[in-house]
Amino acid sequence: MRRFEFALARMSGAAFCVYTGYRLLTSKWLADRVEDYRQRIIAEKKQILRDAAMIRTQIQREMELVRISVRKGHSHQEAATERNSATETMLGVVEKCGYEPYVISPSPREVGYHGSRQFYSLADFRQDYRRDDITDRHIIVMTDVDYYVDMHELIGLGVPILLYTFQPSTVSGEVKDGYFTITDDSVHYRVAGGKDVRHRIWNYNHDTMYVCSRPRGFWANLMQILRDITGVTAICSFLYTKLGIAPFGDPVTMFTVDQFKMGEHRNIVSIVPFATCRSNLLKISEYGAELEYMRYQQRNNIANFNAVTYISENGPLISLGLEGNFASVQLPLQDFENIRTAYELSKTNNLSDTVRRSGRPCKEAAIIHKCLQAECAVVSEVVHKPGDLARHYQAVGSAYDTDPAEQGKCYAREYAPGPLTQTAVFPSESRSNELATIDGRIAGPQAKAKSREHITPKMRKVARDFVHHLVPIAGTGRPYPLTYVEEQQTKPLQRARNDANRYHDEFTMMVKAFQKKEAYNAPNYPRNISTVPHTQNVKLSSYTYAFKASVLQHVPWYMPTHTPAEIADAVQNLAASSTELVETDYSKFDGTFLRFMRECVEFAIYKRWVHLDHLPELTTLLANEIQAPAVTRLGIKYDPDCSRLSGSALTTDGNSIANAFVSYLAGRMAGMDDDEAWSWIGIVYGDDGLRSGNVSNELLTNTASSLGFDLKIVNRAPRGSPVTFLSRVYLDPWSSPASVQSPLRTLLKLHTTCDTQSEIDDIGWAKTQAYLVTDSKTPFIGHWCRAYQRNCTARVVQYADYADIPFWVKNDDHVGNSWPQSESDDWNDIVANELGVTTAELLKHLALLDAYAGPISGLPRLTTSIDLEPKMSVALDGEIQAGPSQNKTSKDGTNPTSDRSAPRRARAALPGDDGHARRSRRSDRDPGKRDAHVRDKRPRRSSPPTRPVTPVPTPSSGDRGTDGDGLGRAAVRQRQRRRTQV
C-alpha cells in the first residue's frame, strides 16, 4: 500500500512539474523575456550601413533628367533614346553625389567606368569579360540588366544601386518602337529592328524591403554544408519556428526603394541598403516584404489570365488580359469589383450584360466577361505610380540649338498631381536656353529699346523735375555701415559670402549670370539672373538701404517695405480717388533700360541725395553697373549694355523709380504740372504698376516707348470692376480691400517646386501651408491646399528654411498683416472666368476636393483647355512646339512675348446705378479679355491696418470734377505757356 501511495505521489509530483513547466514555457512572462533577449541580441548584431540616409536623400535631390539622342535611322530610335537618357541620368546622379559609378553590363559608351561585364545575351559577346572590385566609393548602375542578375546577392553587398528597368502597369501593351505580352509571369518584349527578349520582372513596389543572401566565401559555404549534413540546420529551424530565435542564420539586408518615372512602363529605381542582420534573430517575414518576382498569372480551370493593379493619379486601375495575348483592358478597380459582384448575383449572364455594366466597348467587355467566366480569384500585384519630374522645355532653332545632341538638365519636381490638367513648364538648364535667355531677355530687348528711344529736351527737363521732387534737398545722404548690411543678409549663402569677403576690398567687376529656375504658364525666354561681385553688392547696398529708409519709404507711390495689408489699403485709397484704374504690364523690363533712364533718372537721384564725402565712391559703384563684362554659367560671354543687372542691390528700388517716372512723365506730357503729375503717379512695386485712368492708353504706351520700354495696358477698369496688382485680383477695390492670388498663374504651378534640396513631402506641406496663410478663402487654391494637407502626414515647418514658397510668408510682419480676404460668392466667378470654365463646373470640382480622402496621387484634377501659346520655339514633351512669328499679334491684343498670361473671357457686366450695364474700357476689347463686374457698394473692412500708409493725395487742382475733366483745360494752359529751351 505504501509503495502504491509512494508511486502515486511520484506520478502526481511529476505531473505537477510537467504542468508547471508547460505553463511556464507558454507563459507571457517567458515570451516577454525571450522577446526582450531577442531584441537585445538584434541590437548587438545588426549593423547600420554608413551614410545610407544621406545617400538616399542625395539621390532624390540630384535625380535630374538628362536626355541623350541617338542617330537618325536607328531601328528603335525612341527606345534607344530613352535608354541612353536613363543611363546618362543615373551616371550624372552618382557623380553629383560624390561617388563613382560601377556599371554592370556596360555599353561601349561606359567603357571608362569600373564595372562588370558578363554574358547574358548574344549582344554581350561584342565585349570582353571583366569584373572590377566593388568598393565603398561605388554606386552600382544597371540599364535593363536587373532581370538577369541575382538581386538578392547584389543588394546583399550593401552597395547603393541605381537601375533603369521595365515596370509594366498593364498586362500587355505598346512600348516605344514595340509591344509586350506576359506568359507564365515572364514578359515577352518585342522591339522594332529584331530585338526579342523574355524575362521575369522584379517587384520593387514597396518603400522598404529585405533580401536574404547566401554565405559568401569558401569557408562560410563549407560550414553551411556541414551544418546541413549533421542536422544542425534542422534543429536551428525547429527552434526558430518555436521561439523565433536560433543559432546561425543567413545574412539579411534591409533597403529602401524609390522610383522615378522615365516613360510609359519605364522607371529608374533607387535601392539603398541601410542595415544588415541575421535571419535567425527575427521573424523577418513579419517585418516587411521580401524582394520577389512579380506574379501576374491568375490560374483557373478554363483559361489563365494575367492581372495587375496600378495606383494612378485617379485611383487604382486593374489591367486584365489572357496570357500571351496583346489585347487587354484596364478599368478602375472599383468598377471591376462592382461588375464581378453583379455577375455573381445574376442567375444568367451574357456578354451584353457585361457590356452594359462596364460601359466599355464590346471588344474590351469581352475580355472582362471571359475573366468573369473563368471565375478567377484575381489576386493581383500592385504597381505604384513613381515620382515625376515637372515638365521642362529647351529652346530649338538654328540661333540657339547649336548642339543637336544637347539635352538640358531638369530640376523642378512635383509633390502632387497638378490641380489642373494643364501644368506650368520649366526651362531646362542648357546652353541653348542660355543663348535664348541672352537673346530674348538682354540683347533683343536692348536693340528694340534703342530703336524706340526718342529723348526730347522736354523729357530731360521733366526728368530733372522728377529727381528734384524725389530729393528736394541735395547732399544729405550717408551710407549705412557695412555691418548693418551684413545683419540684413540672413540667408546662409549670404552669410558665407560675407565671411569670405569681409577682409577683401578690391574686386574685378565681372557679371556672372545664370538662368532663373522658375515656372512659366507657357514656354518663354528664361529670365536671366545677373550676379555682381559680393563687395560691389554689399557696398552699394549700404547706400540703397539708407536711401530707402530716408526717402523712398516716405513717398506715397512706393510699395516695397509695406505689408500686404498696407498695400491693399493703398490700392483702395487709389481707387477712392479715381473713377478708373489702369493696370500696366512691362515686357522684358530689365532688358529695356537704356542710358538715359539709368544716368539721368536713377543714378541722378542717388547722386543728388548722397553727401559729397561719399559721392566719388557711389559714382564708381553706379558706373560699375553699366556695360560690365558678363559671362553665363556655361561660359557664354555677352554684353549686358545698360540693362538691369537683376542680382544688383539697385533692382527693386531702381525698377520702382523707373516705373513711377514713366507714370509721372505721362502726366506731364498730358499737360499736368510737377505737383499734379506727382500726385497722379499711382502705386508701384518694381515693374508692377497701378494708376488712375486720367491719362490715355496711347499716351502711356508712347511715353514708355520713347524711353525704350515696352508697356502694354492690361486693363482699364471702371468703378466696380476687378483690378490686378502684384498678381492679386481685387474684386472691387472701390468697396473692399479683399483680393485673391491670380488663380491661373498659381494653379498651373502650385504642385511643383524648384527646390532640389529639401524633402519633397516637407516642401509640399510648407508650400500649401503658406498659401493657406495668404489665400485660405480663395476658391480652388484654398480647397486644393486643404485637400492636400488632409490626406498627408502633418509636419512642422519653418518658412525660412524654404526658398520656393510665396514671398509674403517669409517675413513675420507680412504674415501678421497678410492680404485681406473675404468669402464672397463672386470670387467663384473670378476664378472660373480665369480658368475658362463655368461657375457650376468649378463648384462641382471644389465639392470633389472637399470630399476627397485617399492618396495624394489621386487628388482630383480640373480639366481645362486654356490657350497657353509658347513665346518661343521649344522642345517640350517630346515634341517641337513653334513660337509666335515675329509679326504675329495675339488675338487678345496683348504682347505675345509678355510674361503675364492673357486674361480669360469676360463675364457680363452687372447693371450700374442708372440701370444700364457698366462697360469695362480695356484696350483692344475682345472676348479673350477678363471683364467681370460686381456691385458698387460693399461693406468696408472695419479693422484699420497695423501701421499707417501714406495716402494717395487728392490732386491739388480745384477745377477737376473727375479724373479727366481738367485735362483739356490743362492742355490749353500748357500750350499758352512760354516755351523754355532746355
Swiss-Prot record:
List where Basic and acidic residues composition bias occurs.
913-934
Disulfide bond annotation, renumbered to this chain = none
> So what family is this one in?
Belongs to the nodaviridae RNA polymerase family.
Q: Per the record, which residues fall in region Disordered?
A: 879-982
Q: Which GO terms describe its molecular function?
A: nucleotide binding; RNA binding; RNA-directed RNA polymerase activity
Q: Does the keyword Nucleotidyltransferase apply?
A: yes
Going by the UniProt record, its keywords in alphabetical order are: Nucleotide-binding, Nucleotidyltransferase, RNA-directed RNA polymerase, Transferase, Viral RNA replication
**EC number per UniProt:** 2.7.7.48
What this protein is called in its record is: RNA-directed RNA polymerase
Kindly report, in one word, the top-level EC class recorded for this enzyme.
transferase
